[in-house]
Every structure is written in structure tokens, then in C-alpha cells.
């Protein structure tokens, strides 16, 4: 348990930041899931629109420190490859 005033304040800040990060990570995963569901259904047009909305969300998560930049790029790259394969 935090004893000093500054430690109590840091505990509050950490709790707030954790909630924000959890929300951002969940939002990113939701966008990824929408793309994957569209790919699974075989609908290329829906998959493409879902990918176009998911890409900025994934990159925003990387800029906010939710995921590493390379991880975000890898996710976008793999989703793009799957959508392109669906269109071909």
C-alpha cells in the first residue's frame, strides 16, 4: 500500500493510464477482428474497407506505445497480404 502522497498519486495515475491503454488495445483488436471476419467470409470488398479503417488504428496504437512499431507494421502487412490474396 502506498504511504506517501506522491506514491498515492502515482497509483492513481497508473490506474488511469492502464485503463486508457486497455481501451486502446481492445479497440485495436476489435478492428483487427473485423478484418479477419471479413476475410473468413470471403467478401473482398468488405475486407478491404475493414483493412483501410484498421490500419490507422493499429498504427495509432503503436504511436501511443500500446504495441511496438514493428509489431504494428507486421500486423498491417500480414492483414494486407491476406486481403490481397482474397482479391486475386
Swiss-Prot record:
Signal sequence range: none
NCBIfam families named among the record's database cross-references: S20 (TIGR00029)
Source organism: Methylobacterium sp. (strain 4-46)
Any one GO BP annotation for this protein: translation
Protein name: Small ribosomal subunit protein bS20
GO terms of molecular function: small ribosomal subunit rRNA binding; structural constituent of ribosome
Highest taxon, organism lineage: Bacteria
Swiss-Prot/TrEMBL keywords: Ribonucleoprotein, Ribosomal protein, RNA-binding, rRNA-binding
Role, per record: Binds directly to 16S ribosomal RNA.
PANTHER family assigned: 30S RIBOSOMAL PROTEIN S20, SMALL RIBOSOMAL SUBUNIT PROTEIN BS20C
UniProt cross-references to InterPro entries, sorted A to Z: Ribosomal_bS20, Ribosomal_bS20_sf
Amino acid at each position: 500500500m502506498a504511504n506517501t502522497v506522491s506514491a498515492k498519486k502515482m497509483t492513481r495515475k497508473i490506474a488511469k493510464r492502464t485503463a486508457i491503454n486497455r481501451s486502446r488495445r481492445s479497440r485495436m483488436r476489435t478492428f483487427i477482428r473485423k478484418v479477419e471476419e471479413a476475410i473468413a467470409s470471403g467478401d473482398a470488398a468488405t475486407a478491404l474497407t475493414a483493412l483501410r479503417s484498421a490500419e490507422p488504428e493499429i498504427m495509432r496504437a503503436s504511436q501511443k506505445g500500446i504495441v511496438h512499431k514493428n509489431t504494428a507494421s507486421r500486423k498491417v502487412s500480414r492483414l494486407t497480404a491476406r486481403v490481397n490474396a482474397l482479391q486475386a
